[in-house]
Structure formats: structure tokens, C-alpha cells
């Protein structure tokens, strides 16, 4: 079940609200330009699946997104509990950063916590299988896959070079709850 916890940036210990209904979550995020949709992720894939297998399994959904929204590059992030670089990947994504393009993720297995820092508010979005999240270019955010990650997400880009982050250097992510908290 997707969950949205909304905080003021100065009060990481106490959310202002916690939402669990998709319609409420999507409406709240839409107010700040973020899209959250429920898509069908019924093709069986597991954390650790190869990029080729995941893309092949979800080719119709990928083609639809690329055609509708003009994305030019697709890849897959697939991290399991036994991934040899899970700690390094987690550390990299946990630092607040932004991108020059929209960040689009379609979760086809597992879950992860996308936390968005918009003006003086923090939106922690627990994304799970079937969730498609689209974060506007320039939005400060971080992502937590957890200490024992298990997720597969399809990533779509306008930039042919793929994932390129601009780290803010801010330590705000350290103050807010993580996926395992």
C-alpha cells in the first residue's frame, strides 16, 4: 500500500499528515506538481532480474510512456538483498539531489521511499509495485531502498545519458525517517 507522510522541514519527528488512499496521495502530490499513478505491473519479475528481462516484460507500458511523454532512454534499477553494491547504491541515492529532467519511476516489484523536499515541506512517498511516480525537473529529493533492498523500477529519461544527479550538499535527508524506520 502506498503511503504519503507530509512534514514541515523543521519538524522531521512529526508528520503533519499521513495519507494511505491513492486518490488522496495523488491529489496532494499533484498540488506540488508530482504525479503518482497506479499502473499494472503484473508481469512477474523479481529483485535482481536483468534489465533486458524487465524491459521485455514491460515493453508495452514503456512504449506508451515514451510516446506520450517524449522519453528517449529507459533503464532498470534492480536491487536485491544480495546485490554486491547495495550499500554503495543506497548511500548514493540517500543524499539530497535534483535532476535537470523529470525523474520517472515505474515500480514493478518491491518498494522504496521517495522523499521530496519542496519549498519548506517534505513529502515522503512510499512507492510499491504498480506505482508510477513522476517528479518534476529541479525537485530536491532522495530515495531510500532500505537496509535489505528488494525492488525493481523502470526508469525513463529525456536525457540520452540517463541518470545524472546534481547533489545539493544539504544533510536534510539524515534528519527524516528512512524506509526501515
Curated annotation (Swiss-Prot):
Positions bearing the site annotation: May play a role in metal incorporation in vivo: 96
Family according to the record: Belongs to the acireductone dioxygenase (ARD) family.
Single GO molecular function: iron ion binding
Catalysed reactions, semicolon-separated: 1,2-dihydroxy-5-(methylsulfanyl)pent-1-en-3-one + O2 = 3-(methylsulfanyl)propanoate + CO + formate + 2 H(+); 1,2-dihydroxy-5-(methylsulfanyl)pent-1-en-3-one + O2 = 4-methylsulfanyl-2-oxobutanoate + formate + 2 H(+)
InterPro entries reported for this sequence: ARD, ARD_bac, RmlC-like_jellyroll, RmlC_Cupin_sf
Site (May play a role in transmitting local conformational changes): 102
Residues the record lists as binding Fe(2+): 97, 99, 103, 141
Keywords: Amino-acid biosynthesis, Dioxygenase, Iron, Metal-binding, Methionine biosynthesis, Nickel, Oxidoreductase
Stated role: Catalyzes 2 different reactions between oxygen and the acireductone 1,2-dihydroxy-3-keto-5-methylthiopentene (DHK-MTPene) depending upon the metal bound in the active site. Fe-containing acireductone dioxygenase (Fe-ARD) produces formate and 2-keto-4-methylthiobutyrate (KMTB), the alpha-ketoacid precursor of methionine in the methionine recycle pathway. Ni-containing acireductone dioxygenase (Ni-ARD) produces methylthiopropionate, carbon monoxide and formate, and does not lie on the methionine recycle pathway.
Pathway: Amino-acid biosynthesis; L-methionine biosynthesis via salvage pathway; L-methionine from S-methyl-5-thio-alpha-D-ribose 1-phosphate: step 5/6
Gene3D superfamilies: Jelly Rolls
Cofactor note: Binds 1 Fe(2+) cation per monomer.
EC supergroup of this enzyme: oxidoreductase
E.C. numbers: 1.13.11.54, 1.13.11.53
Cofactor dependence: Fe(2+); Ni(2+)
Sites annotated Important to generate the dianion: 105
Protein name, UniProt field: Acireductone dioxygenase
Pfam families on file: ARD (PF03079)
Amino acid at each position: 500500500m502506498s503511503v504519503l507522510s507530509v512534514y514541515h522541514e523543521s519538524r522531521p519527528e512529526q508528520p503533519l499528515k499521513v495519507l494511505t488512499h491513492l486518490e488522496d496521495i495523488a491529489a496532494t502530490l499533484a498540488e506540488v506538481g508530482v504525479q503518482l499513478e497506479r499502473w499494472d505491473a503484473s508481469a512477474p519479475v523479481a529483485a535482481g532480474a536483468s534489465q533486458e528481462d524487465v524491459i521485455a516484460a514491460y515493453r508495452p507500458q514503456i512504449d506508451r510512456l515514451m510516446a506520450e511523454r517524449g522519453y528517449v532512454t529507459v533503464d532498470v534499477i534492480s536491487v536485491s538483498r544480495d546485490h554486491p553494491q547495495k550499500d554503495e547504491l543506497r548511500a548514493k541515492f540517500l543524499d539530497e539531489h535534483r535532476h535537470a529532467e523529470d525523474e520517472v519511476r515505474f515500480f514493478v516489484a518491491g518498494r522504496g521511499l521517495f522523499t521530496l523536499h519542496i519549498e519548506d515541506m517534505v513529502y515522503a512517498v512510499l512507492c510499491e509495485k504498480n506505482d508510477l511516480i513522476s517528479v518534476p525537473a529541479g525537485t530536491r529529493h532522495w530515495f531510500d531502498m532500505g537496509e535489505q533492498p528488494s525492488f525493481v523500477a523502470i526508469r525513463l529519461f529525456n536525457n540520452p545519458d540517463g541518470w545524472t544527479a546534481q547533489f545539493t550538499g544539504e544533510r536534510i535527508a539524515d534528519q527524516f525517517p528512512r524506509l526501515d524506520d
